[in-house]
UniProtKB/Swiss-Prot annotation:
The lineage of its organism: Bacteria, Bacillati, Bacillota, Bacilli, Lactobacillales. This is Protein GrpE. Participates actively in the response to hyperosmotic and heat shock by preventing the aggregation of stress-denatured proteins, in association with DnaK and GrpE. It is the nucleotide exchange factor for DnaK and may function as a thermosensor. Unfolded proteins bind initially to DnaJ; upon interaction with the DnaJ-bound protein, DnaK hydrolyzes its bound ATP, resulting in the formation of a stable complex. GrpE releases ADP from DnaK; ATP binding to DnaK triggers the release of the substrate protein, thus completing the reaction cycle. It comes from Oenococcus oeni (strain ATCC BAA-331 / PSU-1). Its main location: cytoplasm. Homodimer.
């Protein structure tokens, strides 16, 4: 009987142990289900947060792109404005150049009598005044005798043979037939020149 009680006690212990194991397994299943639910909820929340963050990143990217485009437009506008201001007197200067040429031609004629001399003095003052106004606005004369011929600045009208090789060099300007003018780095009118050749 003692043995029966022992075996029954062992069975009870075993069944109690089995029940405890089952409870533990069920509890761990419940915990894992709860953990899975929490994980899926947190995954959904994080994916929701990620999906919510993606539009924010998109908007931020669009904002920075728009800001960069605005800065580029502002720089382009400033460059165009500076260019316009730099060359704003170009058309006026081009229209004044023929009058300046005519005044220069008038000065090349010698005045014989005192009345002609006074007229020539007035023409000379007008010429100097116009010439100074052009210089003050960045317009300079180009093309002098002895300068190296540059097709970007000069227009060769004729060739002049070299008489004195020590003083006259091939490819240099022999005579300026009409002065050229330049506004900053832009040629308003090329100089009409004769060039020394062999």
């Amino acid at each position: 009987m003692v043995e029966k009680k022992k075996s029954q006690a062992e069975k009870n212990n075993q069944s109690a142990t089995e029940e405890e194991i089952e409870k533990a397994v069920k509890g761990s299943k419940r915990d894992s289900n709860a953990a899975d639910e929490k994980n899926s909820a947190s995954a959904a929340a994080s994916s929701s947060a990620v999906s919510d963050a993606e539009p924010a990143v998109d908007y931020e990217d669009k904002f920075y792109r728009a800001e960069a485009e605005m800065q580029n437009m502002q720089q382009r506008f400033n460059k165009e404005r500076a260019s316009i201001l730099k060359y704003e007197g170009q058309d006026l200067a081009k229209s004044i150049l023929p009058a300046l040429d005519n005044l220069e031609r008038a000065l090349s004629v010698s005045a014989g009598d005192p009345a002609s001399k006074k007229i020539q003095d007035g023409v000379e003052l007008t010429y100097k005044s116009l010439s100074n106004a052009l210089t003050d606005n960045g317009i300079v004369k180009i093309g002098r005798a002895g300068d190296q011929f540059d097709p970007n600045l000069h227009n060769a009208i004729q060739k002049t043979p070299i008489d004195d090789p020590e003083k006259q060099k091939e490819g240099t300007i022999a005579v300026v037939l009409q002065k050229g003018y330049q506004l900053h780095d832009r040629v308003l009118r090329p100089a009409m020149v004769s060039v020394y050749t062999k």
